[in-house]
């Protein structure tokens, strides 16, 4: 048995499917932006508001503010940045405004986005060249707290998506 669709019905069905797909993609983008924002807030709070660093790490001092100002995120889709945190510059203990760090953080996030040519990529960065040195050699929490939070939230997001697609 076959059913003949009325004229224009196929196009209408295709349009509805496309709308649903767009809505799904927008929900993913919104959630990834929320996760990125929370991760950056956690990473910056560890230093600027005397938050608790990740287990096994210590907080670092904000001397020039360039390191904390370089912390932010970019959300990329198919290698192109579709949204980015503000990389807000904060003032250091020495009065330095942290604008250099803000600029370097943005540039580094954009550079890393190009390395992810397919799908979505949530990129959490500390853009100053000495960030890994401070974190790894001096055991200071630069991005660890933010990264751990992002990983946990992403796992939860994946679990929800998996459950929704099973239904």
Show where each model-derived region lies.
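Short, low-complexity, charged/polar segments at coil/turn and helix-coil boundaries
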Residues: 19-131
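N-terminal, Lys/Arg- and Ser/Thr-rich interaction peptides
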Residues: 1-23
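Protruding loop/beta-arch "assembly-hinge" segments enriched in small, turn-prone residues
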Residues: 136-167
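Alpha-helix initiation and N-capping motif
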Residues: 10, 64, 154-157
């Amino acid at each position: 048995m076959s059913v003949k669709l009325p004229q224009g019905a196929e196009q209408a069905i295709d349009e509805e499917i496309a709308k649903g797909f767009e809505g799904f993609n927008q929900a993913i983008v919104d959630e990834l932006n929320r996760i990125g924002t929370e991760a950056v807030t956690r990473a910056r709070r560890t230093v600027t508001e005397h938050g608790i660093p990740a287990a096994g790490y210590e907080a670092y001092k904000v001397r020039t503010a360039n390191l904390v100002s370089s912390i932010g995120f970019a959300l990329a889709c198919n290698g192109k940045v579709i949204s980015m945190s503000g990389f807000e510059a904060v003032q250091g203990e020495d009065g330095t405004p942290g604008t250099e760090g803000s600029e370097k953080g943005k540039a580094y996030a954009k550079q890393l986005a190009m390395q992810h040519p397919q799908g979505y990529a949530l990129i959490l960065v500390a853009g100053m060249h000495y960030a890994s040195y401070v974190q790894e050699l001096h055991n200071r929490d630069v991005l660890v707290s933010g990264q751990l939070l992002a990983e946990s939230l992403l796992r939860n997001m994946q679990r929800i998506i998996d459950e929704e697609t099973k239904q």
